[in-house]
Amino acid sequence: IGITGTNGKTTTSILIHNMLNTLGKKTAYIGTNGFYIGKFIKELPNTTPEIIDIYELLIEAKKEGCEYVCLEASSHGLDQNRLKGLKFDFAVFTNLTHEHLGYHKTMENYAKAKQKLFNMLRNNKYAIINNDDNYKDYFIVKGNNNITYSFTKGDYYIKEYNITLSHSTFSVIHNNENYTFSTKMLGKHNIYNSLVSIIILNKIGYTFEEINKVLNTVE
């Protein structure tokens, strides 16, 4: 599971890691916060380490019996081919804002670097794209199984939401059906992050009821 975007990579990756582990699917995480398999194992020098280091971490995850790996794919890492040779079941685009332009120079270059992740999908696997972002078209790659998410219009979209001091509740429309979810994570940005986790777990095979139960408990 590869996740790219200016904001939301870490939160979304760790959320999916925590949810899958809670559901009994042993899952690793590689990213800004380090290397985890259910719990913290070690720090990493970069959000997306060098390719040889990534392969070592993947071998370790496999030895530990992991079924999934959540990986943060940074624009620097993608541009420098640190993920070369990897294939993904899920590629996620969260958003693109004006950062890292000292390195990429233009927003177009920045988007094209992140786009590389979407050319690394296995056949018939899933590209999950924020339909509310101005740069979404870079990530809707022909031949991919493209899924959009949104607060307005998409394959999965938020119809209503309510944020209190203790939790957020929101309803998701998918295939004209309405599903309600609740999370301890606060803020509209975390509803976006939660929606990505809902889509991925749904595509893995969990029901919306099963997903809501675990989303309610993890942070």
Residues of each region from the PLM?
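Phosphate-binding loop of NTP-binding sites
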Residues: 1-131, 135-144, 174-177, 195-204
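Adenine nucleotide phosphate-binding catalytic loops in nucleotide-utilizing enzymes
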Residues: 104-111, 115, 144-219
